[in-house]
Amino acid sequence: MIEILVITISNPLLIGIYENKKLIKEYKLDGKTSDVLPTLFQKLLNHYNIKRIIYVNTPGSFMAIKVAYIFLKTACLTKNIELNAVSGFEFNNNSPIKALGQKYFINETNNLKVDFLEKDCIICDFKLPLCIEKYNFNKETLPIYNLPAV
């Protein structure tokens, strides 16, 4: 079974191709989600028989999450592919994620807060896991916006 994991809340964008839950190919792409995702997915949809797409729906760049959701939801509906979502904290060792200005999303025992970082805080890069078997993907795929509208 082919599954694709899409992380658009970081730069570069990370896209992993998984066969039987194991990573077989990864893409690290610089650029805007709206430019990069359609070009890559045109190739992926022609090359693989994709059964499921998983994308990061929280927290991070609202625009990147929104664009990814609309694009992936449309692709999944038209190609009859299952869409799931997952938190970005799963792929950066639960490290703070850039929010707005100098503030970051911080996950404290499943309680999300937005705050400034402490001086000794370490930020981890996002990484595609070698295996996606242990992750608990969510069938509720709407983007989760953690900041109020400005």
Where is each model-derived feature located?
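Short secondary-structure capping micro-motifs at structural edges
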Residues: L40-F41, F62
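Oxyanion-binding and handling regions
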Residues: M1-T39, N46-H47, L83-V150
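DPxDG-like acidic metal-binding loop motif
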Residues: R52-N57, M63-L83
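Short, contiguous strand/loop micro-motifs
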Residues: K28, T58-P59
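Short, structured coil/loop segments at alpha-helix boundaries
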Residues: G60-S61, E118
